[in-house]
Amino acid sequence: MCVWREEQMGFYGRWILPQVIQLTMRQKNFAPFQEHTAGAAHGRVLEIGIGSGLNLASYHPDIETVCGVDPSAELLAKARDRVANVGFPVRLLEASSEKLPLENRSFDTIVMTFTLCSIPDPDTALLEIRRVLKPEGELLFAEHGRAPDSDVMHWQDRITPIWKRIGGGCHLNRKVDVLIQAAGFRLERLSAGYQKFAPRPFSFF
C-alpha cells in the first residue's frame, strides 16, 4: 500500500491514486507476498499502510485484534467495507506512520506490505514502529526495493524522481534491509529476488 503526504492530495491524489493502488494490490502476482506476510501474524497486530484492507482476509482467524493505520481516508473507507467479513476485532486509524497515536510496546506483530517504499520519512516511521512493538514482538514485511545489480540500480535512480510523483511517493531505490536494521531491528529471515511479472527496476522484492 502506498503512503503520501497531504500536499499530494489534489484531485489525482485524492480520487484517482487510491483506485490505482487498490487495483494494483489486487493483482494476483502480489497475493502470495501479502498472504504469506499477514498469515504469519499473531496476537495483537498493527498493520502499517492498511490501505483498502486487502490483507484482512489473510490474517489467521485466531489472532487477537488488528489495528490498521493509513493516511488515506478514501482507502480506509474501502477497508471498513471489508471489516464485516472477518472474525476478529479491527480498528482503523487515519494517521501517519511517522507519528503513531498508539501506546509503547502494545503490539505482538507489526505487518507492512509494499508500504515502506512510499513513507515520506521511513527512518522516523521505523523508530515509531519499534516503539509500539513489544520487546519480543515481530516485524513482518514484504517490500520492493533497491536491486543488487548496478545496471538496474542506475535505472531505479533515474526513474524514481518521476515515479514517486505519479506513484504516491513510491521509491524504487530504497534499501529496505538497511533501513530496518538502522532502526534497531535484527533480521532473522530475509529472502529477495527479481520477480518475473515486471521489469527489473520495479520487481526486486
Predicted features and spans:
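A short acidic, Gly/Pro-enriched loop at the edge of an enzyme's catalytic core
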Residues: 98-110
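Conserved alpha-helix/loop element of class I SAM-dependent methyltransferases that forms part
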Residues: 24-44, 54, 58
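Local beta-strand N-terminus motif with an aromatic residue
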Residues: 42, 107-108, 185
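Class I SAM-dependent methyltransferase SAM/SAH-binding core
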Residues: 46-48, 52-99
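A short glycine-rich, Lys/Arg-flanked "PGG" loop and its adjoining helix->strand segment in the class I
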Residues: 123-135
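Class I SAM-dependent methyltransferase Rossmann-like catalytic core
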Residues: 2, 10-28
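C-terminal alpha-helical "lid/dimerization" subdomain adjacent to the S-adenosyl-L-methionine
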Residues: 21-27, 142-202
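A short SAM/SAH-binding and catalytic strip from SAM-dependent methyltransferases
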Residues: 108-121
